Swiss-Prot record:
Primary location class: nucleus
Positions of transmembrane segments: none
Gene Ontology molecular function, alphabetical: p53 binding; protein homodimerization activity; ubiquitin protein ligase activity; zinc ion binding
Name of this chain's protein: RING finger and CHY zinc finger domain-containing protein 1
Known catalytic reactions: S-ubiquitinyl-[E2 ubiquitin-conjugating enzyme]-L-cysteine + [acceptor protein]-L-lysine = [E2 ubiquitin-conjugating enzyme]-L-cysteine + N(6)-ubiquitinyl-[acceptor protein]-L-lysine
PANTHER family assigned to the protein according to its UniProt record, in alphabetical order: RING FINGER AND CHY ZINC FINGER DOMAIN-CONTAINING PROTEIN 1 (PTHR21319:SF53)
Source species of the chain: Mus musculus
Keyword field: Cytoplasm, Metal-binding, Nucleus, Transferase, Ubl conjugation, Ubl conjugation pathway, Zinc, Zinc-finger
Start-end of RING-type zinc fingers: 145-189
Tissue-specificity statement: Detected in testis, liver, kidney and heart.
Binding site for Zn(2+) 2: 33-34, 44, 50
Subunit structure: Monomer and homodimer. Interacts with AR, MDM2, KAT5, PLAG1, PLAGL2, COPE, UBE2D2 and GORAB/NTKLBP1.
One cellular component (GO) term of this entry: ubiquitin ligase complex
This protein's record includes keyword Ubl conjugation: yes
């Protein structure tokens, strides 16, 4: 028979690490939706057919003395510290990871706070080194990750900002780079490809096309600068004349000089 959430919590306390796989805490949340006890909202959502609203949590149960009480950081009976960090808005209990509550995001973020700023247009907290250096897309954090199709805004996984402005979970971004280099939404290069383009320049120069293709040109569309240009066809890649990127797509048929038709 499966262990209850309370039994799981007590067992975790006895074994050392408290809480669940998601959070280190010494209390259980009483779900306002179904009155069941769970270590966290994620554990609840995995086991139920509805979601726990973190903002509506009113009560917690101490996993040490089992006292059911008003949500707070320390047990009113046995003084057990429920979490090194506690947010009275999100009802988040966890180890101290220098978290902070962002009023604009509406939830807690892992800090430190001074290393982040809230971009009002993207509607997301970003690292300060991206201030004025990222492409804004309105409410981009409210879109699901195009790789896993899961939520980004409230995810515990860090978001990665692509040069095009779109967001991916950092873990999804790392997996994507194993298969390709382009944003799955707009096909813009997801990282600086300059070094690879220079290598491709060398390969193209060292790989002449057969004589029947040497004067063939094609119209191309660049996925990086969105420019159009007409270039010589090459099987290894066709380089944008405007930004030198090889992240291009053929935009029309091949053109053969009249004297070769």
């Amino acid at each position: 028979m499966a262990a209850t959430a309370r039994e799981d919590g007590v067992r975790n306390l006895a074994q050392g690490p408290r809480g669940c796989e998601h959070y280190d805490r010494a209390c259980l949340l009483k779900a306002p939706c179904c009155d069941k006890l769970y270590t966290c909202r994620l554990c609840h959502d995995t086991n139920e057919d509805h979601q726990l609203d973190r903002f509506k949590v009113k009560e917690v149960q101490c996993i040490n003395c089992e006292k059911l009480q008003h949500a707070q950081q320390t047990c009113e009976d046995c003084s057990t510290l429920f979490g090194e960090y506690y947010c009275s808005i999100c009802h988040l209990f966890d180890k101290d990871k220098r978290q902070y509550h962002c009023e604009s995001c509406g939830i807690c973020r892992i800090g430190p706070k001074e290393d982040f700023f809230h971009c009002l247009k993207c509607n997301l907290c970003l690292t300060t080194n991206l201030r004025g250096k990222h492409k804004c897309i309105e409410n981009v954090s409210r879109q699901n990750c195009p790789i896993c199709l899961e939520d980004i805004h409230t995810s515990r996984v860090v978001a990665h900002v692509l040069p095009c402005g779109h967001l991916l979970h950092r873990t999804c971004y790392e997996e994507m780079l194993k298969e390709g280099y382009r944003c799955p939404l707009c096909m813009h290069s997801a990282l600086d490809m300059t070094r690879y383009w220079r290598q491709l320049d060398t390969e193209v120069a060292q790989t002449p096309m057969p004589s029947e293709y040497q004067n063939v040109t094609v119209d191309i569309l660049c996925n990086d600068c969105n420019g159009r240009s007409t270039v010589q066809f090459h099987i290894l890649g066709m380089k944008c004349k405007l930004c030198d990127s090889y992240n291009t797509a053929q935009a029309g048929g091949r053109r053969v000089p009249v004297d070769q038709q």
